[in-house]
Amino acid sequence: MSVTNKVLVLKVGGALLQCEMGMARLMDTARQLLEKGEQVVLVHGGGCLVDEQLKANGMETVKLDGLRVTPAEQMPIIAGALAGTSNKLLQGAAAKAGVVSMGMSLCDANMVTAVIKDERLGMVGEVSPKDAKALEFILAQGWLPIISSIAMGEDGELLNVNADQAASVLAKLLGGKLVLLSDVSGVLDGKGKLIPSLNSQEIDELVKLGVIEKGMKVKVEAALEVAQWLGQPVQVASWRDSGQMAALIKGEAVGTQIQPQE
């Protein structure tokens, strides 16, 4: 099997790690996609576990514009929660579903380059695509790479990368289709109703109105960047929704479609 244009990059958030049924459903979806010959990459966050570990160590969680502020002294705890506990929880769920996986992080095999994103955010990284060879090899075996959003700078320091942005960069690296999965069915309007499609102008308007904010703002901006880069829609959907998971297996559109500029 060689790498094809069927690479599907799925991103999941930390809330999934607190839901065994959700993890089982996601991995069953991945298994069915792999059995169809699709190639799947899973990128994950783990904010809930990070918050728990920081609290247990007497440290507080601070966010700026939806991004986690990461002081250097918190980095060992964050790296352990994401590249360690979160990653292995997902590998365990993959094993239960009969999926062969490989636990990885953005540090591995030169897949990305990473620099400090903004001094105000501390050890938060901004990544760019670099070398796809390792991922292409893993995908060609029919395995599922499960990738945490911990990266490494040129001088070896660990950096915390927003998982939506990490998934976006890997979709660019592989020329793949990106689906951002969270615990909500997509982007919702002010009345809590799913918005089926959004372009950049509509996103700007909803941000100004405060309908899209914080973590969803980061997610939608990452999705829009990839949509523009690849010239195809990026989907924002839910791992909680069994109907959306079934549609994903069939290759149907799910959730909110973030559209590229025409």
From Swiss-Prot:
Any GO MF annotation of the entry: acetylglutamate kinase activity
Enzyme class: transferase
Keyword annotations of the record: Amino-acid biosynthesis, Arginine biosynthesis, ATP-binding, Cytoplasm, Kinase, Nucleotide-binding, Transferase
Entry-linked InterPro entries: AceGlu_kinase-like_sf, AcgluKinase_fam, ArgB, Asp/Glu/Uridylate_kinase
A GO cellular-component term linked to this record: cytoplasm
Binding site for substrate: G46, G47, R68, N160
Claim: Ion transport is one of the keywords in the record: no
Catalytic activity: N-acetyl-L-glutamate + ATP = N-acetyl-L-glutamyl 5-phosphate + ADP
UniProt entry tagged with the keyword Amino-acid biosynthesis: yes
GO BP field: arginine biosynthetic process via ornithine; L-arginine biosynthetic process
HAMAP family with a match to the protein in the record: ArgB
Protein name: Acetylglutamate kinase
Gene: argB
